[in-house]
């Protein structure tokens, strides 16, 4: 079972419906400190979505240009789902809860429906297998104050961790959290801006920690470079794939978000990843 299936399986463990109508807000396209001379291009990526409802953001750091498909959805805040593991891993590293890719959290003995979760896991293993209980332990050890401080520095969506223990979409407390269809929300554009801030802009993060984070986000070789990212899967046809491609030290950031209850049987983190890769391949060909 791959990590995207792990997320889907985990999110349906005695899931409770949250309803479709969420209080959402449109957000600025970029962080306040990134607004200078940013350009937006509205694009049509519908051919890659094949009838699935969703949106996509691609950000070219060289030209400082955002390419937006379904702009309104790109600026609408939703749950980050398991893409938040990028931030929780960084928070763990920055606060010395985690020290390297082999930092281990102890398994509690509960029999989970996902076999790869049923043992002690390293950071690398937990990230690859999208293990909720591992990152639940990490954020609890880091604590609410330091998590919130990091979210404010990143300008990460609404930075709302008020439902710290989550919305009880899963029956086990260690499989819930504020980032799983709960209080924390972020838009696809904000996802891209966050990644750009972490990996391409001046910040106060430890360079070794950023390198560890980058290593665990590695997905595959991509053309003449590498693809890095994280999937996220939720209930009722919600899914993410966010990350960047790096070629000769130049990065192109992206976020694909799907939300389609009518096609929920085919919507997954894997599907979002497939769409993102197709968009990026076409985008690169047009920009060679």
Per-range role (PLM):
Residues 77-102, 126, 191, 254:
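Active-site SXXK
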Residues 93-110, 205-210:
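Short, well-structured active-site flanking segments
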Residues 3-46, 77, 140-143, 196-288:
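Structured C-terminal helix/loop/strand segments within mature extracytoplasmic catalytic/sensor domains
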Residues 103-119, 142-143, 166-169:
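Acidic helix-start/capping segments at beta-turn-to-alpha-helix junctions
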Residues 72-79, 110-125, 133-140, 175-183, ...:
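Second-shell loop/turn segments in exported
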Residues 31-80, 96:
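Short pre-catalytic segments that frame enzyme active sites
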Residues 51-53, 73-75, 79, 83-84, ...:
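Extracytoplasmic
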Residues 122-123, 137-195:
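Mid-domain, small-residue-enriched loop/turn segments at the edges of structured enzyme/sensor domains
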């Amino acid at each position: 079972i791959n990590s995207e299936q792990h997320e889907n399986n985990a999110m349906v463990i005695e899931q409770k419906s949250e309803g479709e109508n969420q209080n959402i807000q449109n957000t600025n396209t970029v962080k306040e400190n990134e607004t200078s001379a940013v350009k937006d291009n509205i694009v049509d990526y519908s051919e890659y979505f094949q009838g699935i409802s969703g949106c996509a953001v691609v950000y070219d750091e060289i030209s400082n240009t955002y390419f937006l498909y379904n702009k309104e959805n790109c600026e609408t805040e939703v749950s980050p789902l398991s893409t938040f593991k990028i931030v929780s891993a960084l928070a763990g590293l920055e606060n010395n809860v985690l020290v390297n890719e082999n930092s281990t959290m102890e398994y509690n003995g509960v029999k989970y429906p996902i076999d790869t979760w049923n043992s002690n896991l390293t950071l690398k293993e937990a990230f690859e297998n999208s293990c909720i209980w591992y990152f639940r332990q990490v954020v609890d050890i880091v604590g609410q104050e330091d998590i919130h401080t990091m979210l404010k520095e990143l300008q990460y969506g609404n930075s709302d961790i008020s439902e710290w223990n989550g919305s009880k979409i899963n029956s086990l407390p260690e499989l819930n959290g504020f980032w799983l269809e709960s209080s924390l929300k972020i838009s696809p554009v904000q996802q891209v801006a966050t990644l750009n801030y972490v990996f391409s802009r001046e910040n106060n993060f430890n360079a070794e920690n950023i390198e560890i984070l980058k290593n665990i986000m590695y997905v595959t070789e991509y053309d003449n470079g590498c693809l890095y990212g994280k999937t996220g899967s939720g209930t009722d046809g919600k899914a993410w794939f966010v990350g960047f491609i790096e070629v000769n030290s130049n990065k192109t950031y992206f976020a694909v978000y799907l939300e389609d209850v009518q096609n929920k049987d085919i919507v997954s983190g894997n599907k979002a990843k497939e769409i993102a890769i197709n968009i990026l391949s076409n985008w690169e060909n047009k920009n060679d």
